[in-house]
Amino acid sequence: MSSLYSKLIDDLMEEISKMEKGAKLPSERQLCDDYKVSRTTVRKALGYLVNSGILYQVQGRGTFVRESNKENLSNYYSFTEQTRKNGKIPKSLVLSFDVRKASPEECEVFEEKEGFKVIAFTRLRLADDLAMMYETSLIPYERFKEIDKKLLESKPLYDIFEEDYKSKIYNIKERFSVSSMTSEVAKTMNLEDKSPCLKIRRLSYDLEDDLIEFTLSYARADLFYY
């Protein structure tokens, strides 16, 4: 991805975050003039934002804001933010941390070949020291090899991505389903076996549409707020 293309997307996202839903963007020609880039670069950037669900286009009318960047990224569940909104103190305990080869199924999720290495870790998420969520996560080892257990316990994962690696999340795919806890999850959270829970499957992508996080979360149904 060219630096001009990447920078234009960042600049457009900044402007879109200030616009109202349904607002019309300047014409392609105006964007070319404003950002000093070619029409090809403008079209590629707009196409990316359309495919990401941030903009939509109407033939003969132009390009419009479907949802501001801030709104779009706040639609996914953030345990840290939600816990603070509820007036509680969030905390993460790293229960396990390992660097290993991804399984065939995991390689398929990341669209990588056999031998692909991941950092695999399990976290217990607490609110005022009460266990609320059990999470297992995978991130690419070669890209984030300096991440360790201590760093994961010190600040949110997405803050690590952005502040330590300059990797901003631009697209998140989540799937929610009602489930029941396994014996291991229930025991860790001091709950009865097969306690009801909300299962969250999350895939997080960067600007280049590379998958940089695959997480499965199990949230206790009796205290979970979203």
Language model features with spans:
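Short glycine- and basic-residue-enriched patches
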Residues: E28, S74-K88
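Beta-hairpin "wing" of winged helix-turn-helix
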Residues: G53-G60, R66
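C-terminal all-alpha effector/ligand-binding and dimerization domain
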Residues: P90-Y226
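Extreme N-terminal segment that seeds HTH/winged-HTH DNA-binding domains in transcriptional regulators
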Residues: M1-R39, K85
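Conserved hydrophobic residue
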Residues: K21-K24, L55, A131
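Residues in the recognition helix of alpha-helical DNA-binding motifs
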Residues: A45
